[in-house]
Structures are given as structure tokens and as C-alpha cells.
Amino acid sequence: GYHEIFICEMGARRVGEIKELCDIASPKYGIVTSVGPQHLETFKSIDNIIKTKLELANNLQPGGAAFINADNEYLRDNMPAGAVTYGTREDAAYSAVLKSVSSSGTQFSVRYPDGSIHDFTTQLVGAHNVTNLCGAIAMAHYLDVDDKAIYDGVCRISPVPHRLQLIKKPGMIILDDAYNSNPSGCRAALDTLSRF
């Protein structure tokens, strides 16, 4: 069959691994979602993590674009030239605003670079998921995906088991974030819980 878009995650445990993956996949577009201390054991320093994550932005095909999370201070302070920014900051090219989080999901809006505002609803919960979705929305819009298709896609996304998964039982709601927690993930889960 014919495919228009191939999406893959590029994870790494050492400097140079994302460049190696770029040499194989030859991406034209890339999203860098975050840099944090959760990988310090293998990378030894935040600078090594930043360098490795930005290997994606620095190894895109000509004419491509890097989408960078402007909410992440490490990425913001090391922003590649020409990057398309996204996040909850007002100065991001694609700027998201969280409207509500409940056991039914999350409502938010995204301001596009042309100033238009688009409302979204997702089954995912948590402010961090709004930032992640904003990156996907930014790239989809940049690639001229139809607005309705973007909206419908965001609505259809369902939680991955054990990653801030809401489980509703009679008389209770369970927020299951047991997959592979780290300090920033735990903070995100507690922040989400505090919004209920």
C-alpha cells in the first residue's frame, strides 16, 4: 500500500544514537518533546542529553522542519535556528491553552501562527499531554493536514495502558500511571490528580 507519513520514536541511551537513527530513517520532519534528568544515568550530563535530543533537529532532510517544545527550558535555551516552536508559552508559534481536565478527558485550544484559535477535546488527561498534542497538531497543520482530520485524530487518541490511564469503577476513579514512572512523570500525575 501507499503511505504518506511514517512516524517513529527515536530514543537513545548514548550520544550519537539519534543521529544513527536519522541516518537510517532519513526524517524530513521531527518533534523534540523534552529534555530532562531521567536519562542522567546513561548520559552523565544534561548537556549530553540536550546534544543527543537535538541530533534529530540537526539531521533532517533539506527543506524539513524541527518542532521544538518551547515549554522545556533546556530546549528553549538551546533552540536550533529555524525551529518551529510549540507549547503553552504565549510566544510559541503554536500556543496551547489548557481549558479543563476531568475524568472525561481534557479540553484545550491551540493558537496557530496565523492567529486562528482551534479548540480540541481529548480522552488523554494532564497538562503535559496538551503540550505533547500541541506538537503533533503543529506538525500536522504545518504539513497541511485538514483541520477536521486533525481535530478528529486528537479526539480519537486513547490512553496507553498504565500511562495516566483513567479507569472508572463504581464509586471511584483510578489514575493508573504505573508503567515507568520518573520524578517528572510523577509530578505530572499529581498535577493531573489535583485538577479533579
Could you say what each language-model-derived stretch is?
Residues 20-36:
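Inter-motif core of Ras-like GTPase G domains
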Residues 19, 23, 54, 58, ...:
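Amphipathic, non-transmembrane alpha-helical secondary structure
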Residues 14-18, 130-133, 183-186:
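Short glycine/serine/threonine-rich phosphate/pyrophosphate-binding segments
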Residues 1:
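Conserved substrate/cofactor phosphate-moiety recognition/catalytic segment
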Residues 4-15, 174-180:
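Switch II (G3) loop of P-loop NTPases
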Residues 23-24, 138-144, 194-196:
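Alpha-helix C-terminal capping segments
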